[in-house]
UniProtKB/Swiss-Prot annotation:
Name of the featured protein: Glutamate 5-kinase
Localization, UniProt: Cytoplasm
Domain annotation PUA: ranges: 281-359
Residues binding substrate: S52, D139, N154
Phylogenetic lineage: Bacteria, Bacillati, Chloroflexota, Dehalococcoidia, Dehalococcoidales
A GO cellular-component term linked to this record: cytosol
Length: 373
C-alpha cells in the first residue's frame, strides 16, 4: 500500500470483533488491527479509535463468565476493564513507536458548545502530536450507555467523534461484512449491500431484523451512526474486521463492506454541533407537508406545519425535529418556547399576534438555524 485516500479516520472496534465471540479480548486480533493502524499512521493518516471491550476485559480479569445485567455491576467491570484495555493497546502500539492516550467521554461533555469545542481541540492537539487516542464512553458514570439506551452506544459515539474532528472516513468494524438484504445468520441467501446513497425506511427495517449478541450496538445503531456521519460530510463504512488488512484496504479505497456516501453539503462547525443531537432540549413534531418542505427544499419551519412540541424548552434552545411518524428530520434553534408553540401550532403566520399578543416572527425555526439529516 503506497497511498491512502483519507487523511483523518475514526475507527470503531466493536465488542464482537475484539472478543471473537468468546467474551474475552482476542489479543492476536487486537495486535493485527493495531499493526494496520500503525502502518496507516506512517502514511500520514490521523487516526482516532473508538474502542468497545472495557466490560469484556473486566469480566475476563475477574473470571466472570456470565454477561451481567445489573447496572452497578457493569460499571464496576467497566472500571476494572478500562485500565486493562488501555494497557493492552499501550503494549500493542509501543513496538510501532506509537503512544496512546485515553479519552473518556459522556454525552454531557459535548452537550454545550464550549464542551464540544474543548473536546475537539484536545483531540486535534493529540492527533497533531501523532498520538493514537482511544475513545470510549465513560461507562462508570454514563448510565444511559450501560443500560443500552439508543443514543449511548459506541457506534453512535464513533459518529459523534467523526463529526467532532471533521473526519474524512468512519470505519465501523464488526464481525459481519456489512448490511445485508436480510439477516445472513438466518437467511444464507442474503446478499451484501455494497453502497448506500440514502438511508431509507426500507434499510432501517432491514437493520432492525439483524442480530448481534455481544455488543450494545446491533445493525440499527450502526445505521444511525452512518446517518449522522454522512450528514456531517463523512464517508461511513461497515465492514468485517476479520478480513486480512481490512483497515488498509478500506483506507486505500478498495470495495469491502457497505459504504455510505456522504452528503455533498459540508456543514460548518455550528451545524455539526447541532447535528450531534447532544444539546437538544426537546422536540417539535411536524406534519407531512412541512416534513417534505424541510427535507427537499430546506425551507423555514412555520407554525402552520407544527403538530406538537415535546419537552420543556425556551426561545433560542436547540430542538430535534421529527415527522408525524416519529422519524428524525434534523435539528434547529427555535424562535418560540414550548409553551408558545403549544398555543400557535397549526396556525397561519398572520394569526400569531392575536394569540400571543406579539410574536418573534413568522418562522418557528428559520432555515439559517436549521440542519436536516
Amino acid at each position: 500500500m503506497n497511498e491512502n485516500c483519507y487523511k483523518r479516520v475514526v475507527i470503531k472496534l466493536g465488542t464482537s470483533l475484539l472478543t471473537g465471540g468468546t467474551g474475552k479480548l482476542d489479543h492476536e486480533r487486537m495486535a493485527d488491527l493495531c499493526r494496520q493502524i500503525a502502518e496507516l499512521t506512517r502514511l500520514g493518516t490521523e487516526i482516532v479509535i473508538v474502542s468497545s471491550g472495557a466490560i469484556a476485559a473486566g469480566r475476563s480479569k475477574m473470571g466472570i463468565r456470565h454477561i451481567p445485567k445489573d447496572v452497578p455491576f457493569k460499571q464496576v467491570l467497566a472500571a476494572i476493564g478500562q485500565s486493562q484495555l488501555m494497557n493492552y493497546y499501550d503494549q500493542l502500539f509501543s513496538p510501532h513507536g506509537l503512544t496512546v492516550a485515553q479519552g473518556l467521554l459522556t454525552k454531557s461533555d459535548l452537550s454545550d458548545r464550549s464542551g464540544y469545542l474543548n473536546a475537539r481541540n484536545t483531540l486535534l492537539a493529540l492527533m497533531e502530536l501523532g498520538i493514537i487516542t482511544i475513545v470510549n464512553e465513560n461507562d462508570v458514570v454514563a448510565i444511559d450507555e450501560i443500560q443500552q439506551a439508543k443514543f449511548g452506544d459506541n457506534d453512535n459515539l464513533s459518529a459523534m467523534v467523526a463529526n467532532l474532528i471533521e473526519a474524512d472516513l468512519l470505519l465501523i468494524l464488526t464481525n459481519i461484512r456489512g448490511l445485508y438484504t436480510s439477516d445472513p445468520t438466518l437467511h444464507p441467501e442474503a446478499t451484501l449491500i455494497t453502497e448506500v446513497k440514502e438511508i431509507t425506511e426500507e434499510l432501517e427495517q432491514l437493520a432492525a431484523g439483524s442480530s448481534n449478541k455481544l455488543g450494545t450496538g446491533g445493525m440499527v445503531t450502526k445505521l444511525e451512526a452512518a446517518r449522522l456521519a454522512t450528514s456531517s460530510g463523512v464517508t461511513a463504512i461497515i465492514a468485517d474486521g476479520h478480513i486480512p488488512d481490512i483497515i488498509l484496504k478500506l483506507a486505500n479505497g478498495e470495495n469491502e463492506g457497505t459504504r455510505f456516501i456522504p452528503s455533498l453539503h459540508k456543514p460548518d462547525s455550528r451545524q455539526r454541533w447541532m447535528m450531534s443531537g447532544l444539546c437538544t432540549r426537546g422536540s417539535i413534531c411536524v406534519d407531512d407537508g412541512a416534513a417534505k418542505a424541510l427535507r427537499e427544499n430546506q425551507k423555514s419551519l412555520l407554525a402552520a406545519g407544527v403538530q406538537q412540541a415535546e419537552g420543556k424548552f425556551g426561545r433560542g434552545d436547540i430542538v430535534k425535529l421529527t415527522d408525524s411518524h416519529g422519524k428524525r428530520l434534523g435539528y434547529g434553534i427555535t424562535n418560540y418556547s414550548s409553551d408558545d408553540i403549544s398555543k400557535i401550532k397549526g396556525l397561519h403566520s398572520q394569526e400569531l399576534n392575536a394569540v400571543l399578543g406579539g410574536n418573534q416572527g413568522p418562522e418557528v425555526i428559520h432555515r439559517n438555524n436549521l440542519v436536516v439529516i
